[in-house]
Amino acid sequence: MRNSIPYELSVKLGDANIHPELEVQSGSEAAHAFAIDVIYTTDAGTRCALQKAWALAEHLGAQVRLIFLYAVPFSLPLTAPAVSLPFLKQKLAGLAGSFPGEVSVRIYLCREPIRALRDLLPESSLVVLGGGKRWWPTRAQRLETRLKKLGHPVIFAETR
């Protein structure tokens, strides 16, 4: 996956401190049981999506994975984003900190987010997105449409 560099870490929800369990720069994926993928859209949308995913995960015995895609401009090296990784980690820890249980947080530095999602999501992955709905498609709604075209079942958690 030359389009992106993954940075993986595990965050115990309910604990705003983020502790990197694993930071990798390879495409290796640990084998896990059934997982629900939450893709970051906005703070409010992601918070809503995490609530929905956590409710589903409790009933299904699934792991919740929060995926944050950061598009690095072509003018910068992929290994040197404009935003620091510690800042992104703290931001995601703050989002995840209000939920019980555990979530796996993955930060991907990429050039093209949709291409990175196509490469990293296993076939038919259950995806939860959050965001507002309007009569014109929002960014989150367009992402929902693209993921459905790639064959992923998508649950849209609407913010109010």
Question: Each predicted region: which residue ranges?
Answer:
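Membrane-proximal amphipathic alpha-helices
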Residues: T138-R139
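Structural beta-alpha unit
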Residues: M1-A30, F99-V127, R134, L143-V154
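Small/aliphatic-rich secondary-structure junction motif
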Residues: G27-T79, L150, T159
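A conditional alpha-helix N-cap/helix-loop micro-motif detector
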Residues: T46, L85, I107-C110
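Acidic, Ser/Thr-rich peripheral helices and adjacent loops at domain boundaries
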Residues: T79-A93
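Glycine-rich, N-terminal phosphate-binding loop of Rossmann-like dinucleotide-binding domains
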Residues: Y40, G131-G132
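Short helix-loop-beta junction
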Residues: H59-L60, K91-E102
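Short beta-strands and strand-loop turn motifs
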Residues: F68, V127-G131, E158
